[in-house]
Design a protein with these regions (language model features):
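Extended substrate/RNA-proximal surfaces in nucleic-acid metabolism proteins
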Residues: 1-59, 63
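Mid-to-C-terminal alpha-helical segments outside catalytic/metal-binding sites
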Residues: 108-135
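Active-site neighborhood of phospho(di)ester-bond hydrolases with catalytic His/Asp-centered motifs
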Residues: 35-37, 64-67, 93-96
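Active-site environment of divalent metal-dependent phosphoester hydrolases
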Residues: 16, 41-45, 70-73, 99-103
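His/Asp/Glu-enriched short active-site or ligand-binding loop at hydrolase and phosphoryl-transfer sites
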Residues: 60-72
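Charged helix-capping and loop-helix junction motifs
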Residues: 21-24, 47-54, 76-86, 108-111
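Short acidic/histidine-rich active-site segments
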Residues: 90-106
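Structured loop/turn residues at beta-strand edges in well-structured enzyme cores
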Residues: 2, 88-89
């Protein structure tokens, strides 16, 4: 990402813990720092927020949630997952996942405002900037 050792990693929705660990380890051994894109979509992760935290701590993978999920989780499980990780300080970045201006618009400002209300202001700023730049 941007000439750094960070690499955005998107996995399958039904990926197993072992396969996710193997992918992260392979990238780490190659000298990269994996940033796991929207872990709130991966069934194994969303079913066990505590295990996701353990996964993050053990593998060194960073977690990037979608701004849409922060603003309006699609279901109880996404809400529980997102709130738990934010409370634990285990989210490393928030990104828009914008594909166009109509169906998936950039909503980082709204996500940032939500984060400043529901988390620490410094943490909110850290989440919407990555390497000193707005995500």
């Amino acid at each position: 990402m941007g000439g750094t050792d960070y690499v955005l990693l998107e996995l399958w929705r039904n990926i197993s813990w072992q396969t996710a660990q193997d992918a992260v380890k392979q990238l780490t051994r190659a000298g990269y720092c994996p940033v796991l894109a929207h872990p709130e979509r991966y069934l194994a992760f969303i079913r066990s927020p505590k295990k996701t935290l353990q996964f993050r701590n053990e593998t060194g993978a960073l977690l990037q949630l979608n701004a849409d999920t922060v603003l309006s989780p699609r279901n109880y499980w996404e809400r529980r997952f997102t709130e738990y990780l934010l409370k634990e300080g285990a989210v490393d970045a928030i990104a828009s996942d914008a594909h166009d201006c109509i169906n998936r618009p950039v909503n980082m400002e709204a996500a940032y405002q939500w984060l400043t209300i529901h988390t620490d202001a410094a943490y909110a700023k850290e989440l919407v900037t990555f390497g000193g730049e707005l995500t």
